[in-house]
Amino acid sequence: MFSSIYGYFNSEGDSNQQQNNNNNSNNNLKESVFHSGISNGIIETVGNTPLIRIKSLSEATGCEIYGKAEFMNPGGSPKDRVAREIILDGEKKGLLKKGSTIVEATAGSTGISLTMLGKSRGYNVQLFIPDNVSKEKVDLLEMLGAETKIVPIVGMNNANHFMHCAYQRCLGDDMAFYANQFDNLSNFNAHYNGTAKEIWEQTKGDVDGFVAAAGTGGTVAGISSYLKEVNPNIQNWLIDPPGSGLYSLVNTGVIFHPKDRLVVEKLGPRSFYEGVGVNKKTENFNKASLNGAFRGTEEEGVDMAHYLLKHDGLFLGGSSALNCVGAVKLARKLGPGKTIVTVLCDSGHRYTSRLYSKSWLNDHNFQVSDLSNLNFVK
């Protein structure tokens, strides 16, 4: 069985033969994951991740808090689902062909997934990455074979924003395929048809609330939309990091209040959280079905990551920690006896030089709180 990205992987045979077979195999790929016990390449190992009861949070809140262990996908994140859907859809539409280059703007995880799955299908991969991404992720992307372009963090109105750079790269190049994870609805579909249905089946329909952070919006939108359809009483909430405008969008209908706009448009999100928090309403996020939004701080995320490692042996990344902060806030809002689900979207392996580095934490004025209780969640 494939473990996360730290295992070896090879291309699925000769690339010429792959391209001839891609279109014929797409439907089979979507149906056969894990069914036979033998996977036809890495692309079939995506999904069907465990749902983990987080004991410490459950006991402290009086709710049942579960984490969907998406870090156990072969590429280490839920972006494997998105990459698979985007690639298979691109092949089906004839947009991906022999010699194509997949181009994307990514904070790392989508890039890892696109590179692994793209290489396994015989494609080149070029990634535009904001400069707040951890060195571990960039090194890994290059090791996996991606061409990386590191660009400064700037506001969405700046032509040098990493999303604009990726889009411009593809103009006029028929062999360049813009994955466009932010607005490509294959992202939403991957979670609506996959992750959400798995959660519903694993909980046997016993879900009172769902909470997660959003970047592209595909995970939150796909899961919240499906859960709301099967049970309109489910409470779906967003947890949003500093510098992101989605908290305001959900609660007030506008991305920013005027007093915040100039600062954020100039600097962009300042948070160390990778892959979550944006200042743009994406096509994927537009399909979300949310009841409200919480704000989560950097300090809460740091403390939660260390709390879960100490009490549950869960070695999680920043985005997963933020989601767990959201789970505690939602549990407090709904009250004891409820079942809350969130997404454990990344492991701590890609954060060893930052979130789990004493020197980095000290340099950035973070001090881990008393981890005997959840008082650090405000």
Swiss-Prot record:
Compositional bias ranges of the Low complexity kind: 15-28
Entry keyword annotation includes Oxidoreductase: no
Region (Disordered): 10-31
EC number(s) stated in the UniProt entry for this protein: 2.5.1.47
Keywords: Amino-acid biosynthesis, Cysteine biosynthesis, Pyridoxal phosphate, Transferase
A GO molecular function held by the record: cysteine synthase activity
Family: Belongs to the cysteine synthase/cystathionine beta-synthase family.
Protein name per the record: Cysteine synthase
Originating organism: Dictyostelium discoideum
Gene behind this protein: cysK
